[in-house]
């Protein structure tokens, strides 16, 4: 058996090449209710945060916030959009949860809906 080493080369021209814009919309992966827990390897779980399912589409330093139904909520959460837009990348499409984090570390949907006196609003991203 031969030992084969694979190498990926990246040149400056590769990195600075024009990119196709990220998609306008990606259908979110939603949880599915089941009567039995799946068995076997390859299954994972995640914390259920109490918030709004949100996509963030980043292009040239600006982020758009999109609900799970595709509504643009950028104007509702401009600080979150600005923070996500400051991520050092050329472009990205994030899928996550917009949450109001309480001082005890839990999330509160009611506090998020009030939006005025929320101790901390943040977006957890589950996939890119």
Language model regions located:
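Catalytic cores of nucleic-acid ligases and guanylyltransferases
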Residues: 1-128
């Amino acid at each position: 058996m031969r030992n084969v080493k694979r190498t990926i080369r990246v040149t400056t021209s590769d990195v600075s090449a024009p990119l196709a814009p990220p998609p306008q919309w990606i259908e979110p992966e939603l949880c599915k209710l089941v009567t039995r827990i799946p068995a076997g390897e390859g299954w994972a779980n995640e914390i259920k945060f109490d918030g709004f399912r949100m996509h963030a589409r980043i292009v040239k330093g600006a982020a758009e916030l999109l609900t799970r139904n595709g509504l643009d909520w950028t104007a509702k959460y401009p600080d979150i959009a600005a923070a996500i837009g400051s991520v050092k990348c050329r472009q990205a499409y994030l899928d996550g949860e917009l949450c109001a984090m309480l001082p005890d570390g839990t999330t509160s949907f009611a506090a998020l809906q009030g939006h005025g006196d929320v101790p901390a609003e943040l977006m957890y991203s589950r996939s890119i």
